[in-house]
């Protein structure tokens, strides 16, 4: 039998398939704190519980796992986040009461303002302060996924400007510094942070200014290669 003949007679439904889903931990920065997008479940299991945006793979429209994650996020926010990366894969027999389940989880960042109108117009999606989320009973194992995503983002705050993708552009340097401080849980020396940023050359000066504390502050945008840049030394050095 040739491979073509084998495939012509192959029936994928003859084999029991595990549940395969994607989930996304979407962060933003608003009111000087990190927030996470949660959606309220309208079906069992965990009916009425809050959880991560996500769902099953659509084999007809999704060309990749990331496509599936972006599709689910766009359904809730109407926009595509400027930063997304695969966080982890979790699979076992007990995370979903419907059966053996595998989820591929992504972490993503976007500005609050980018989807504010859409989120404000619905009742089943909401930005929650991260510290509140960590105390909530969530669907499935979503709390553990959020904790893992937070740790990943905290590590990135040490050696990159990735947290800046949670800011609305244009932003000031103090705003960029503060989102790093929120993640690290401690203040960063301002001159040291500015020096790291200038050496990295990852910001575009818009030429605009915003008055903060009586002083005009330059407004910046992130360059396209910001996500891949790593500081030579982390911010704690």
Model-derived regions, located:
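Conserved Nudix-box catalytic region and its N-terminal flanking loop in Nudix hydrolases
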Residues: 33-79, 157-178
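N-terminal strand-loop-strand
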Residues: 5, 9-51
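Long, intrinsically disordered, low-complexity Ser/Thr/Pro-rich regulatory/activation regions
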Residues: 207-237
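Short helix-coil junctions and helix-kink-helix linkers
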Residues: 178-187
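NUDIX/MutT-family hydrolases
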Residues: 55, 107-108, 117-153, 166-174, ...
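RNA substrate-recognition surfaces in RNA-acting enzymes
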Residues: 188-218
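Active-site segment of metal-dependent pyrophosphate-handling enzymes
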Residues: 18-22, 66-70, 74-118, 130, ...
């Amino acid at each position: 039998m040739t491979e073509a003949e084998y495939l012509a007679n192959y029936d994928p439904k003859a084999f029991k398939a595990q549940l395969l889903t994607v989930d996304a931990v979407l962060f933003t920065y608003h009111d000087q704190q990190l927030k996470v997008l949660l959606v309220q479940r309208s079906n069992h299991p965990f009916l009425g519980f809050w959880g991560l945006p996500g769902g099953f793979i659509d084999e007809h429209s999704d060309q990749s796992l990331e496509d599936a994650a972006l599709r689910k996020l766009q359904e809730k926010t109407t926009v595509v986040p400027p930063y997304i990366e695969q966080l982890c894969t979790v699979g076992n027999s007990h995370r979903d009461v419907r059966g053996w389940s595998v989820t591929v989880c992504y972490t993503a960042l976007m500005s609050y303002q980018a989807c504010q109108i859409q989120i404000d117009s619905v009742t089943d999606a909401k930005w929650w302060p991260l510290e509140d989320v960590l105390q909530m009973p969530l669907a499935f194992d979503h709390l553990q996924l959020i904790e893992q995503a937070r740790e990943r983002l905290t590590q990135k705050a040490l050696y990159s400007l990735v947290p800046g993708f949670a800011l609305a552009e244009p932003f000031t340097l103090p705003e960029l510094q503060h989102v790093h401080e929120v993640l690290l849980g401690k203040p960063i020396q301002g001159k040291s942070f500015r020096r790291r940023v200038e050496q990295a050359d990852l910001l575009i000066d818009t030429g605009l200014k915003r008055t903060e504390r009586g002083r005009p502050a330059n407004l910046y945008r992130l360059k396209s290669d910001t996500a891949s840049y790593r500081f030579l030394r982390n911010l704690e050095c």
